[in-house]
Amino acid sequence: MLVDLLAEGEKEIAYLETVLYEVESAPGEAALNEIRAELKGQGYLKYYKPRDKKQKPADFYRYLSSDGFEILVGRNNLQNERLTLHTARGRDLWFHTKNAPGSHTVVMSGGRDIPDRTREEAAQLAVLHSSQAKGVKVAVDYTEVKNIRKTAGLKPGMVLYDKYETAYITPDPTLAEKLKKK
């Protein structure tokens, strides 16, 4: 029983670390409002009254790879979940830093094979949108979206995956600006 409580506590800490990272890197009020709504839904905040009910949620970060593939990056746990479980499709490639808070990053394949250069760029973006952005040789797991699942009891943005590969990336901070979709 104590072991179960400790395991549950470790999951809570991991989840709250991802929320902290998202708050620290939130690009604006819309993203913070989404995080507030998530925390309310999880019972961490007792109430939340949005200032502007008509404000639409922030969109994913959007990039275009050197090979012409769209790369989408979630801004917070709710967006990560929406991106991975609802927007992305089976053969799209999903990237995430291994064992570290960060954004889900998806290459939209459109049914095409994804070149190595685009995979490298997506892995770079996954690192740049994570708590490991200043790291060296950061481990990034990637797999097809069809290998990702969510089970009951997992917090928003938390997923399970298998049949993955791992790339080791030293981030290039200038890459995100080069690939940003206009």
Regions found by a protein language model. Name each.
Residues 28, 76, 172-173:
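General structural signal for secondary-structure boundaries
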Residues 7-70:
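Coiled-coil termination/hinge junctions
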Residues 4:
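Segments forming glycine/polar-rich beta-alpha architectures that bind adenosine-containing cofactors
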Residues 14, 21, 110, 124-134:
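Hydrophobic alpha-helix feature that most strongly marks membrane-spanning transmembrane helices
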Residues 9, 114-131:
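Short secondary-structure subsegments characteristic of cysteine-rich extracellular domains
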Residues 44-122:
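Domain-scale macromolecular recognition modules
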Residues 129, 133-182:
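Intrinsically disordered, low-complexity regulatory tails
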Residues 1:
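Short His/Asp/Glu-rich catalytic/ion-coordination signatures at enzyme active sites or charged loops
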